[in-house]
Amino acid sequence: MSAPPAPPPDRSAPPDRTDSAQTEPTRPLVRRARRARMWLEPGLGVKRWIFLFVVCTFVGAVAFLHFTWTGPLHPLATKWILWLNQFAEPGVFPLYAVGMVVMALALAGALYSITMISRAMLRGTGTAPETAVNVLYERKTLSRGMRVVTVGGGTGLSNLLTGLKTHSSNITAVVTVADDGGSSGRLREALDMVAPGDLTDCYAALSESPALARLLLHRFGRGEGLEGHTFGNLLLATLSEERGGLGTAMQDIHEILKVRGRVYPATTRPVTLVAELADGRTIRGESRFAEQIRPSRIERVRLEPENPSALTQVLEAVRDAEMIVLGPGSLFTSIIPALLIPDIARAVRESPAPVVYVASLMTEPGETDGLSLSDHVNAITRHLGRTPDWVLLSNSKIEPAVQRRYQQEGATVLTLDGAGRDLRGRVRFAPLIQAGTARHDPQKLAAALMQLWDGPPRRFSLPGQRD
């Protein structure tokens, strides 16, 4: 049972100025003490150098003492000791105590000078000295995080990356680039490049700088030829043009943006997504799916041209991964298209890492109408050649008002109804919904994935549901 809430402060009472006066001056000291203590945290790689500094200082002092007494500086050392004698008081402040005080002052001066040199160097690199220990601790911690490969596109993938970057910097996002609408479609047609839109969203999600993220996502509202484009899309198009292709420009992009992790297109070859429908029709172009699929349904999707190649960096990341996450995102336009690239599908099939499918919260009008969770998993298995080891499904309830709004558009909640025993054994439940929306909460989703990775997966039971 939770504790009762604390009573509200008595605003009628005068403030305790004595306590305030005593607290304010100590706050900077407390913050400095906390920062100093953080330098001693495990894993920073700092304590070993502090220990080496202490040992070398002691050895150097002893060696210098030996040199002064046995070498040409002996007369000077004698004069120095005689001069210090005037500060000694026999029985009260002996000569050795004077030496200890001088030694402590010298050591403090040396440490102060080293600190100021470090602060000057940090300022020169653009790092605030006050936050240096926090940045170092964060980067060291994140560098030991899970090696995870995410596959997908759209808002779902960028949401996932926003949450994952607080747990690990060993992230590789493999992004579907078959979009042919909007700014991406215009740049793709004009420059014969892959669609950059979802790549831009992922770079913004992994950015350490909120200002840079806003800049990448800025969409021009005016200007001939610029209207409708985002700055990030234009940046990727510029680097692709300058380097002769997006594949060769990826390293430059990562160095410029300095994001946590890596973002790669599923292929650097412009491809068109083709849907084969149950009524025998074929639709070419992702942007046409939502309008032209109804009243039929998608049986399969494929790429034109077939068998595009994948980047070597993507295949290496899949081989080294400790977890492969599919989604969240549109089943037929974000997740499966990346799995249609033979090299990626083969690498995922052969990977010893668990494959986790993050199920959508709702069906998508015009794309997954009438499909159950079993249909989603079967579609992935059919295109990939491997069944996901785990299926992560939200057990949070969508607010009725939000649910009604989606139902008016033809979307329904995706549930476990009708699932077989095998699928039920793979499902893991967790509260994943962002309050007031029908979207995954980035932090909740990342925490659920980390729980799967950290130890034996925990099963959450849906209210009123039985296997």
From Swiss-Prot:
GO terms for cellular component: cytoplasm. Residues 1-27 are annotated as: Disordered. Gene3D superfamilies: CofD-like domains. Coiled coil: none annotated. It is found in: Cytoplasm. It comes from the Bacteria. GO terms for molecular function: LPPG:FO 2-phospho-L-lactate transferase activity. Its main location: cytoplasm. Residues 1-12 have a biased composition (Pro residues). Keywords: Cytoplasm. GO terms for biological process: regulation of cell shape. The keyword Cytoplasm applies. It holds the Pfam family CofD. InterPro entries: CofD, CofD-like_dom_sf, Gluconeogen_factor. Belongs to the gluconeogenesis factor family. Required for morphogenesis under gluconeogenic growth conditions. This is Putative gluconeogenesis factor.
